[in-house]
């Protein structure tokens, strides 16, 4: 009878691109020595769609419905960054009411994104129950989005100079009711998760990043603030009307997966504070700067013909991008979402470079998982919070 021999060589394991814990089509080539991770190589690009090149062959109005496919769980932020660039290039003023509506929608989108991070993150480390609680609250946010924009996801709500439509009758009261209800739900999550000994065993002192290390890697968002760096673009860049509200930047100094969890929980509570203040203080006035609608004002007689009205293509309003370059950024749920925009006196951008937070934050994954256990890969990857739509673009 043959005696089984023990192999001592390293083992290479492919995780993904179809693994449920990969949060999209991410592939990890993991080198293992037993349960210990020796090396990890992320392979990205499976969801690449050429979004930057598409932007350079479209007007901003034509491109706007497509940008929601970058980070498809926080679509308001991709719309915000797409209209902020042309607004700054053209010195277009946004009415105060429109700015308040934008802030409300952005913070609701931040809560929805953090909720859909928290549910799968808990499922990855073995806790299924919170996932169902979290979807309950997230559906309420999507109900609010549907009432205001007509769409539960991929809203196409932001416009250059404002938003597409004003808030419907009764929406503000409905949103205030949601805020009160959600704060109770958030307390439930914390009771269920934060002091759970099994949860703490999986996340405490796992995936530690120091402050200087986080800056050197170019990390942003909760990944940066969990390492003791108090950097939030809503406070730093003073965009929209965030300065008019009373709220605190959430940060921790431990730098581990638990710190990143605590920051996102804290950010949801702060987002509710911002939304409540904005709803109670929202001013009257227009929801869009109508003066910047530049339609072709020449009227042609064939415009009333049957063929034109029902068959021909109508030109969309075009905004000429002045000949200069500009970098604009917003504080998205996953970090700094930026656009480097170059105009050349054309309605098309000459260059449209996307700076996705998930792609930059993912760079540090191989360093974090080395010398850890195989099971810790799921914890660390989940705490980074990536969406492959924005990683691959």
Curated annotation (Swiss-Prot):
It is a peripheral membrane protein. GO terms for biological process: photosynthesis, light reaction. Its EC number is 7.1.1.-. It is found in: Plastid, Chloroplast thylakoid membrane. The keyword NAD applies. GO terms for molecular function: NAD binding; oxidoreductase activity, acting on NAD(P)H, quinone or similar compound as acceptor; quinone binding. Keywords: Chloroplast, Membrane, NAD, NADP, Plastid, Plastoquinone, Quinone, Thylakoid, Translocase, Transport. It catalyses: a plastoquinone + NADH + (n+1) H(+)(in) = a plastoquinol + NAD(+) + n H(+)(out); a plastoquinone + NADPH + (n+1) H(+)(in) = a plastoquinol + NADP(+) + n H(+)(out). It is an enzyme of class 7 (translocase). One of its GO terms (cellular component) is chloroplast thylakoid membrane. HAMAP family: NDH1_NuoD. NDH is composed of at least 16 different subunits, 5 of which are encoded in the nucleus. Belongs to the complex I 49 kDa subunit family. This is NAD(P)H-quinone oxidoreductase subunit H, chloroplastic. It comes from Spinacia oleracea (Spinach). The gene is ndhH.
